[in-house]
């Protein structure tokens, strides 16, 4: 099974110079948690997640309209797979890169779609439940292992929660 059977199409994108305010609005309007950042040729150069926006706002102490993806995407590893890659290759790449979403590219490197762990879980669950042939079912073991790894918290970053008292 190839990843192009699972990937989301018609992905909303932004440019490196877009404001994080605009990126957050795209996420809200299209009910998604990540927006790929593309260059003028529609080739992925990074990705902005809802967590990136929250952390940028908190750490930079600036309004979102004054922040752009280019301020942090170049320090992140670009995680992509090709649309003809197998589900297993995509899972392996997500696991090795420690990501929950991976951009999918065409043979020419342009953005074709995106796949999230939620997409994979939904697809594998549906294919296993609806399959009449064992050859069409998906082995959930690698999916579950990948979910465990990318969902694990980084203990060195965890801090006890403290109550915030209003002024």
Name each model feature, range by range.
Residues 13-31, 38, 80-98, 104-107:
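The conserved cystathionine-beta-synthase
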Residues 44-45, 54, 105, 111-112, ...:
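Short hydrophobic beta-strand segments in globular cytosolic domains
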Residues 34-35, 45, 78, 101-103, ...:
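Structural motif
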Residues 15-18, 22-60, 64-70:
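Acidic (E/D-rich), amphipathic helical modules within compact regulatory domains
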Residues 13-14, 34, 69, 101, ...:
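Generic alpha-helical hydrophobic packing signal
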Residues 1-10, 49-99, 116-167:
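Tandem CBS (Bateman) regulatory domains
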Residues 25, 34-35, 103, 110, ...:
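Aromatic-residue detector
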């Amino acid at each position: 099974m190839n990843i192009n059977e699972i990937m989301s199409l018609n992905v909303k994108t932004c440019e490196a110079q877009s404001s994080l305010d605009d990126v957050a609005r795209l996420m809200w309007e299209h009910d998604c948690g990540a927006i790929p950042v593309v260059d003028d040729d529609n080739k992925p150069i990074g990705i902005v997640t809802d967590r990136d926006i929250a952390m940028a706002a908190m750490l930079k102490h600036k309004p979102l309209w004054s922040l752009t993806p280019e301020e942090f995407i170049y320090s992140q590893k670009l995680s992509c797979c090709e649309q003809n890659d197998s589900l297993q290759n995509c899972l392996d790449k997500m696991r090795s890169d420690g990501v929950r979403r991976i951009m999918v590219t065409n043979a020419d490197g342009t953005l074709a779609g995106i796949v999230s762990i939620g997409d994979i879980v939904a697809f594998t669950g549906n294919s296993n439940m609806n399959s009449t042939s064992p050859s069409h079912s998906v082995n959930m073991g690698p999916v579950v292992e990948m979910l465990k790894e990318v969902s694990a918290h980084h203990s060195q970053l965890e801090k006890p929660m403290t109550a915030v008292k209003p002024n």
